[in-house]
Regions:
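Glycine-rich phosphate-binding loop and adjoining beta1-alpha1-beta2 segment
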Residues: 46, 51-89
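Conserved N-terminal Rossmann-fold NAD(P)-binding element of oxidoreductases
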Residues: 27-29, 52
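Hydrophobic/small residue at the entry helix of a nucleotide-binding pocket
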Residues: 33-34
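N-terminal charged helix/coil linker that caps or initiates catalytic domains
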Residues: 1-26
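Conserved SAM/SAH-binding loop
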Residues: 98-106
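Short, well-ordered coil/turn residues at beta-beta hairpins
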Residues: 120-121, 144
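Glycine-rich phosphate/adenylate-binding loop
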Residues: 2, 112-113, 126, 136, ...
């Protein structure tokens, strides 16, 4: 019978669609990358998704985040994404976690119930903790490396973390994961050399914070605020979603 996933099923097949419908994917970080991951997963037929983020939509998110509009400024990203998901497919089971993932709260998440984990968080500490937890629970994970300060969306690659180059975040992750005995990690990274952002305090979040009320205003604590574009993190997110969908659909993990 014709349905909203009929065109997808023409490529993947009925058995693959059943796998996707029965899968539960956790997306950590619902920002420039993570938002597009969620969008593509839901449009591809994933049946259950966990959304993990404690941030609110900010005016500065409008340039790149799929959940950011004038109407959603000030709303929690998890709430906006949940509403968007149900507008696309009301049958998706959505579990929201209004918090940032940290080593301290890692045990609060039902990792045993996840079929796949997407790491789209910003900090190295959280990324490492998430990778370690996924490894401990034997859950497949894919991690997003740096998408800020990049101009060339065609430079993204899928690779093992130990085969990456150029990306400063990937370099730190390689070092830290090697220390912890992690043998492999699928990542999406850019081979493009980062562009140094223009130093202009008049448009810097560090000195002109406009975070919504109730937000943690962490931008004022950051050493550097990366530049970003609509067509770069979105592509990274779609590539990640493609890997997750194919891994689940074709039982590659």
């Amino acid at each position: 019978m014709l349905n909203q996933f009929s065109r997808t099923q023409l490529l993947l097949g009925k058995e693959a669609m059943d796998r996707l419908k029965g899968a539960r994917v956790a997306v950590f970080g619902i920002g420039g990358v993570g938002g597009y991951v969620c969008e593509a997963l839901v449009r591809s037929g994933v049946g259950a998704i966990d959304l993990i983020d404690d941030d609110k939509v900010c005016l500065t998110n409008l340039n790149r985040q799929i959940i950011a509009t004038r109407k959603t400024i000030g709303k929690y990203k998890t709430d906006v994404m949940e509403e968007r998901i149900h507008d696309i497919n009301p049958d998706v089971i959505v579990v929201t976690h209004r918090c940032f993932f940290l080593p301290e709260n890692a045990d609060e998440f039902p990792f045993e119930e996840y079929d796949y984990i997407v790491d789209a968080v910003d900090t190295v500490t959280a990324k490492i903790a998430l990778v370690m937890k996924a490894q401990e629970k034997n859950v497949p994970i894919i991690s997003s490396m740096g998408a800020g300060n990049k101009l060339d969306a065609s430079a993204f690659k899928v690779a093992d973390i130990y085969k990456t180059s150029m990306c400063p975040l990937a370099k730190v992750m390689r070092r830290e994961l090697k220390k912890r005995g992690v043998k492999k990690l699928k990542v999406v990274y850019s081979e493009e050399k980062p562009t140094r952002p223009i130093e202009d305090m008049s448009i810097s979040c560090r000195s002109n914070c406009i975070c919504p009320p109730g937000a943690e205003h962490k931008c004022t604590e950051r050493r550097d605020i990366p530049g970003s574009l609509a067509f770069v993190p979105s592509v990274a997110g779609l590539i990640i979603a493609g890997e997750v969908v194919q891994d689940i659909a074709f039982d590659r993990v």
